[in-house]
Amino acid sequence: GDSLDLLNNLASNSVDLVMTSPPFALQRKKSYGNEDQDLYVDWLLGFAPEIKRVLKDTGSFVIDLGGAYQKGIPVRSLYNYRVLIRLCDEYGFKLAQEFFWFNPSKLPSPIEWVNKKKIRAKDSVNPVWWLSKTNQPKANISKVKVEYSERMKKLLKNADEFYTPKERPSGHQISDKFAKDNGGALPSNLLEFPNSDSNSQYLRLCKEMNVKVHPARFPQKLPSFFVNFLTEPGDLVVDIFSGSNTTGCAAEELSRNWISFEQEKQYIAASIFKFLPQESLWQADEIYTKLLIDEPSGFKLPQSMLLFEVNNYCC
């Protein structure tokens, strides 16, 4: 359904995280729906007042907003930066930090400038804006530590061979605490998550049942990072452009409450394939059909009972 109408049904100050990836302002129309580039900024900003209203003071708004080229010329559009600036200047959001999602498996695009004329590099990075309602949103970077580098692993085994605690020429003080094992390294704001899934349960069941696959899915590791980073178990996560409901799946696996909005009923119904445990796969066709006719469907998960209900294309 219309995400703006559905947002109106949420209570003020009730949401801990809005995590979403809206249809980008691409020059070519997509089957999943995307606004014309000239109208896009105003269209997307139409959601800003309601997003800010439903967010808690400690809440965050994370938006994956990839870039695009201007029509017919090898010059980048600034639409996503205009969205960011206006969200902050006109609607009072705070830019907590900018992240960049690097997808090493992304295909070269646009074909005209990259493949044919070879005058531009492959576009493999999406800006991801982390915005907040106040200056102090809830966050804990220690919950999303990454694996140490091989060199750091060697240092932890035998610190004396690698460095001596002292002040560096740069003025930085490297103490003996540098060799402490903290269970992982703090992540940077460059997030490398390949988007190369080709054999997931969702894709297999869509193929078996001849159900249309959502064509613009981000990898689950992306929303999982921000759900872990910015919320606690039991918090409420909302995706206003859910597509195949990857954000909802990430939230479910991390024991968060979640609500997802999607304008295409078929996409939101098919997203049930991501949640079905192995012992319920035989029910996939029945559950999918029930959801298409707005009949709630529940099934047992390893740790809980999930009631999956499509209500005006919201689940």
Give each language-model segment a name.
Residues G1-A270, L307-C315:
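Core catalytic lobe of class I
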Residues G1-L7, F273-C314:
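S-adenosyl-L-methionine
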